[in-house]
Amino acid sequence: MSSLEISSSCFNLETKLPLSPPLVEDSAFEPSRKDMDEVEEKSKDVINFTAEKLSVDEVSQLVISPLCGAISLFVGTTRNNFEGKKVISLEYEAYLPMAENEVRKICSDIRQKWPVKHIAVFHRLGHRAASLEAVSYAIDTLKAKVPIWKKEIYEESSSWKGNKECFWASNN
């Protein structure tokens, strides 16, 4: 049984990485610039507790926004053992009204602390602290060490942006 949590501080539809493999194959969703400009998006929180199999792609689509530049995700899975015992499955229960209320409070706390556009939280079980620390390290280290530039393309012009967090870009 897999589980998943996804929060978003957005996604930029103009990002093009021609040498990279696509994240979602055969994606039929390609909004036009007109559609993107006309959309006034309100922030949303999507909360779901389910016993059904979860799809990273489906949940990711819930948090994509043309106003933002990234989607942050955490995917938790079930370990195959615990304290030397083989785990074959998990069963879980929740008092849904209370669980949903508590997750809404968490979403509210997130919005007070960070500029997040959309949040989707799908119920998960398991330990996540080490995984989240590893993801944070990967992102911070990538930004500090990997020479990546982006080109922002506007309606009338474009501009190359260097990674200000990279050690080689600092003004010493």
Swiss-Prot record:
It comes from the Eukaryota. Pathway: Cofactor biosynthesis; molybdopterin biosynthesis. Keywords: Cytoplasm, Molybdenum cofactor biosynthesis, Phosphoprotein, Transferase. It is found in: Cytoplasm, Cytosol. One of its GO terms (molecular function) is molybdopterin synthase activity. The modification Phosphoserine is found at residue 20. It catalyses: 2 [molybdopterin-synthase sulfur-carrier protein]-C-terminal-Gly-aminoethanethioate + cyclic pyranopterin phosphate + H2O = molybdopterin + 2 [molybdopterin-synthase sulfur-carrier protein]-C-terminal Gly-Gly + 2 H(+). Its EC number is 2.8.1.12. The keyword Transcription regulation does not apply. Substrate binds at residues 127-128, 143, 150-152. One of its GO terms (cellular component) is molybdopterin synthase complex. Its main location: cytoplasm. GO terms for biological process: Mo-molybdopterin cofactor biosynthetic process. The keyword Phosphoprotein applies. Heterotetramer; composed of 2 small (MOCS2A) and 2 large (MOCS2B) subunits. This protein is produced by a bicistronic gene which also produces the small subunit (MOCS2A) from an overlapping reading frame. Belongs to the MoaE family. MOCS2B subfamily. Catalytic subunit of the molybdopterin synthase complex, a complex that catalyzes the conversion of precursor Z into molybdopterin. Acts by mediating the incorporation of 2 sulfur atoms from thiocarboxylated MOCS2A into precursor Z to generate a dithiolene group. This is Molybdopterin synthase catalytic subunit. It comes from Pongo abelii.
